[in-house]
A protein has these predicted regions:
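Short Cys/His-centered divalent metal-binding micro-motifs
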Residues: 36-37, 67-93
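Helix-rich interaction surfaces within compact, conserved domain-sized segments
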Residues: 82-83, 89-118
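Short, surface-exposed loop/helix-turn segments at secondary-structure junctions
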Residues: 46, 51-66
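Short cysteine/histidine-rich zinc-coordinating motifs and their immediately flanking basic loops
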Residues: 42-51, 85-93
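A boundary/linker detector
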Residues: 1-42, 50-51, 56, 105-122
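Divalent metal-coordination and catalytic microenvironments
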Residues: 26, 45, 75
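Short, structured coil/loop segments at alpha-helix boundaries
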Residues: 16-20, 60-61, 75, 95
Length: 122
């Protein structure tokens, strides 16, 4: 029998960037799109317009997600829409500053490390 080939797991270089407790906190909010009451809510990562002093390890990249402090809540429909039309078009269409919303949630996070990371960016 042939051995099944699997892709190697992508490794995140640098300090920890995944905070499941923070993502759960974000999923506890309503969809970021005004007037939307759909669910379930997903934690969506912001990739565009990150602060210039964001360390490389927290920016994400090919096969890597950005730091979990850069997440905002969206229902499944709007999360798919964000990927389909692009992050900047999605933000312009709904008149939302995704980064500002994500950082606002990160400042109120129940995870001290997330709050500390956001403070280091300002």
């Amino acid at each position: 029998m042939l051995k099944r080939r699997t892709r190697p797991k992508m490794r995140q270089d640098g300090p920890k960037c995944e905070w499941p407790r923070h993502r759960k906190f974000v999923r506890g909010h309503t969809c970021i799109v005004p007037g939307c009451a759909d669910g379930p809510i997903e934690a969506c990562h912001v990739r565009k317009g990150l602060p210039s002093n964001t360390p490389d390890f927290a920016r994400g990249g090919v096969g890597k997600k950005p730091h979990d402090c850069f997440v905002f809540p969206a229902c499944s429909k709007h999360h798919k829409s964000q990927h389909a039309i692009g992050e900047l078009s999605f933000a312009a269409l709904h008149r939302i500053n995704l980064l500002r919303e994500a950082l606002d949630l990160a400042r109120r996070s129940p995870v001290p490390e997330v709050r500390e990371f956001v403070r280091s960016l300002t």
